[in-house]
Amino acid sequence: MSRFWNRRVRDLHPYVPGEQPKVADLLKLNTNESPHGPSPKVLAAIRDAASDDLRLYPDPTAAVLRDTIAARFGTTSDRVFVGNGSDEVLAHAFRALFHDDAPVLFSDVTYGFYPVYCGLFEQPFRHIPLNDDFAIDIDAYTGDCGGIIIANPNANTGIALPLEQIETLLKRHPDRTVIIDEAYVDFGAQSAIELTHRYDNLLVVQTLSKSYALAGLRVGFAIGSPELIEGLIRVKDSFNSYPLSRPAQAGAIAAIQDTDWLADITARVIASRDRLVPELQNLGFQVLPSCANFVLVHHPAHKAGAIAAALRERAILVRNLSTPRIQDWLRISIGTYEACIRLTDALRDILSPRS
């Protein structure tokens, strides 16, 4: 605690990211990164952008990237906002679109950045408990609120909501912004982007970090009504007018355009997930149904922390989260076929009875 910190900083509870240790032969299954590399077209575009033009500022409006996203998702560029990763996009959305005269609503088990944003921007919030089966209870999202954010598929559980339930929320709260955070949507859920033309209170946020295999590039985007997008732009231009570098914009354009690569690597992740789930169940784990690039698992006979520690001794990282309802669960990112074999072999050894 420093005497130089202001009150707001003293009261912050910052987000804690998954660890990124430098260990030889490390198998990282803790931060939901892609096990496959980005499109070769992306790498070529980034190399081409690394020219003498780096002496110049990038386009502050990222016009070509926004046009590319608009074309890809059947909308117009005035409905598209881009930022330095979806975390920045979400932060701007909390600041611009959520009101502080009533609590922001989100699940008790979800992305850990949501309460951090509320703390930073001094917005009240209320956790809405998941059902006993860890599904989002739409009927509980009632009453006055400052806005609503739903991760779909839900962060940490991987369970997805159907679009008709999202529509229920939009109709119930027509004068409040509803944000659907679709970081994992490409792994088996249905995007709500098609609803943005019918509901002016809907903002859909996606990232290139997961399914596009570009966590290191830091690009995210939002799609919504022009008035929502203008609110985000006002906040961006009051904070950082140039959030995306020239290489980032070039790489993101190539990634959005290479739909074949996206389809291939997401299909491979889904296939690995479908193989891993029964293997984990055969080892005694309860596995929640996942539409994401991870699974949330619980073993009734073994503590999650002990399993995570034993895996770490074998240079395998998984995430043992501190959220109260899932503190005895493990979130395991989906790796390659070979990575999943290494994981299950290690778990089999850890869980086997010792004589």
Swiss-Prot record:
Gene Ontology biological process: L-histidine biosynthetic process
Modified residues (N6-(pyridoxal phosphate)lysine): 210
InterPro entries: Aminotrans_II_pyridoxalP_BS, Aminotransferase_I/II_large, HisP_aminotrans, HistidinolP_aminotransfase, PyrdxlP-dep_Trfase, PyrdxlP-dep_Trfase_major, PyrdxlP-dep_Trfase_small
Cofactor(s) for this UniProt protein: pyridoxal 5'-phosphate
Disulfide bond residue pairs: none
Keyword Secreted: no
Keyword DNA damage set for record: no
The enzyme's E.C. designation: 2.6.1.9
Annotated Gene3D superfamilies: Aspartate Aminotransferase, domain 1, Type I PLP-dependent aspartate aminotransferase-like (Major domain)
Catalytic activity: L-histidinol phosphate + 2-oxoglutarate = 3-(imidazol-4-yl)-2-oxopropyl phosphate + L-glutamate
Enzyme's top EC category: transferase
A single MF term (Gene Ontology): pyridoxal phosphate binding
Pathway annotation: Amino-acid biosynthesis; L-histidine biosynthesis; L-histidine from 5-phospho-alpha-D-ribose 1-diphosphate: step 7/9
Keywords: Amino-acid biosynthesis, Aminotransferase, Histidine biosynthesis, Pyridoxal phosphate, Transferase
Similarity comment text for this entry: Belongs to the class-II pyridoxal-phosphate-dependent aminotransferase family. Histidinol-phosphate aminotransferase subfamily.
Assembly mode: Homodimer.
PANTHER family: HISTIDINOL-PHOSPHATE AMINOTRANSFERASE, HISTIDINOL-PHOSPHATE AMINOTRANSFERASE 2
HAMAP family given in the database record: HisC_aminotrans_2 (MF_01023)
Protein known as: Histidinol-phosphate aminotransferase 2
Name of encoding gene: hisC2
